[in-house]
Amino acid sequence: MSQTAYRTHHATEVTEALVGQKVTLAGWVDRRRDHGGVAFIDLRDSTGLVQVVIYDEDMARPLRSEFVIQITGEVRLRPDGNENTHLATGKIEVVAETIEILAKSDALPFQVSTALENESENKLPGEDVRLKYRYLDLRRPSMQYNLKLRSDMAKAARHALEDMDFTEVETPTFIKSTPEGARDFVVPARLVPGSWYALPQSPQLLKQLLMVSGVERYYQLARCYRDEDFRADRQPEFTQLDMEMAYVDQEDVMAMTEKVIAAIWKSAGYEVQLPLPRITWKDAMDKYGSDKPDLRFGNPLVELTEYFKNTPFRVFQAPYVGAVVFKGGAATPRRQFDAWQDWARQRGAKGLAYVVFGENGELKGPVAKNLSDEERNGLREAVGAEEGDAVFFAAGSRESAQLLLGAVRVELASREGLLDPKKFAFTWVVDFPLFKPTDDPDDDDVAVGHSKWTSMHHPFTMPSKDWIDKFDKDPEHAMSDSYDIVCNGEEMGGGSVRIHRDDIQARVLDVLGITKEEADEKFGFLLEAFKYGAPPHAGLALGWDRTVSILAGADSIRDVIAFPKAGGGRDPLTGAPAPISDEQRAETGVDYDPDADEN
């Protein structure tokens, strides 16, 4: 790093090679220790720590934690036995000759010292306090690491894409409101009273227009905005690595994305084996109860619908019956099984049926007595359990029961310590349905259109080749050319082949119940562009915050965003959202009443 007006070196640049030389350093007082008239200070900057020794008591006396100081001194080796192998600078120290206090610090609301970062007694405050004082929270080494990692990942992605002849293009932030599956954030247009801009949920339509424009390979780190109900690990504003290509198919986009992912992970010291595995959406749901399966561990779901087809147990007289094995679960106390019932009810289920295989294969549990002798005798083999295991069941509609069992599978793995954050299990999920029922959207998705069907991904997704001629005749079974990239049970990103023909787009919109007039009003500019020669195109977007959090091993995406929002979109740091003044309301026209003009 280059020399500046305040320093000759950063902390971790002070090595044994500089012994006997003078250096000037600048940073925060991380920690101070006094030993018999000699003060030791750990000086912290963005690179790490270096130990400073102060023999002058008058020089050391005013220094406190988080004071910003500049020191000049001579580098020397630490005395034998005083080396710190945990520090990059652990073999040397700097003997201070002069110290200047550049800024003082009040007592901190919580400690940010590197020395306390990994100590159990260093209890961080609640997240609202951390976010209110985010500038202090970001001083912690783990947060500095996350921000640097995010930057390095972006650099690696850019290099990989530019090596593949992609062009970075910035798209507008003020656009027209278009249906994309969530609510828009809107901004009043002061110069056009009564009219509003929308902040983009994604650059979807704009990047398709770039394909029509002749930009054959586009990317950007795009800011996106979605006005969603609060969910634990979502943000109202987020970043995605957006990529689109012309004259390509699904295989081309997947191959390109794999190269980008490999480059990103390599920047952090990991090798990703290519090509990545694939699983169909149906197999993912059947085997793992999730369209974003965590493949760091096994224990797939077992379908028992056929096994229980003649069961006397009414609960299992359902369209779908499935199970997941709880290894060693027979030793679980009854109260813990009761807690599992509460866990299931919190997820909207009525409960969680179970049996245990005791000694000598004896079947126990509340479900056991309801099964026939034949069902009891063959159950252990049917589910692949062993003596000492337990088995959880779910019955009902296929999707709801599989989702519950999939959640059980992951919860079991979590409790068994199988979710290693440094193990990365990638997979593509392919062959998604084109549509899903409007009354069954994921979480708080807003259904696009006015029919019984809405888009599984978005309304601009191309039907698969086998379905192009008939998707509107059988929407329930129609399949799409779409694909998601999943890692460790998290959806990192998703993409699809896009519709580039106005006749196919019109048929998809018709299935969604979007009239021609509404389509022209919402996104007629895209349909108009298709009339002038739109090349086949496809793309994918990686959720950047999620991708960084996976590689960082962070508990939340908020830990890899510099200034995230808290629950409900609140910003404890700045106080946003906040009321605006009456003058601002009048200027922006948020209360504009067109009828008032007529009067």
Curated annotation (Swiss-Prot):
InterPro entries: Aa-tRNA-synt_II, aa-tRNA-synth_II, aa-tRNA-synth_II/BPL/LPL, Asp-tRNA-ligase_1, Asp-tRNA-ligase_1_N, Asp/Asn-tRNA-synth_IIb, AspRS_core, GAD-like_sf. Its main location: cytoplasm. GO terms for molecular function: aspartate-tRNA ligase activity; aspartate-tRNA(Asn) ligase activity; ATP binding; nucleic acid binding. It catalyses: tRNA(Asx) + L-aspartate + ATP = L-aspartyl-tRNA(Asx) + AMP + diphosphate. One of its GO terms (biological process) is aspartyl-tRNA aminoacylation. Coiled coil: none annotated. Residues 565-599 are annotated as: Disordered. CDD domains: AspRS_core, EcAspRS_like_N. It comes from the Bacteria. It holds the Pfam family tRNA_anti-codon. Its EC number is 6.1.1.23. One of its GO terms (cellular component) is cytoplasm. Keywords: Aminoacyl-tRNA synthetase, ATP-binding, Cytoplasm, Ligase, Nucleotide-binding, Protein biosynthesis. HAMAP family: Asp_tRNA_synth_type1. Homodimer. NCBIfam families: aspS_bact, PRK00476.1. Belongs to the class-II aminoacyl-tRNA synthetase family. Type 1 subfamily. This is Aspartate--tRNA(Asp/Asn) ligase. It comes from Bifidobacterium longum (strain NCC 2705).
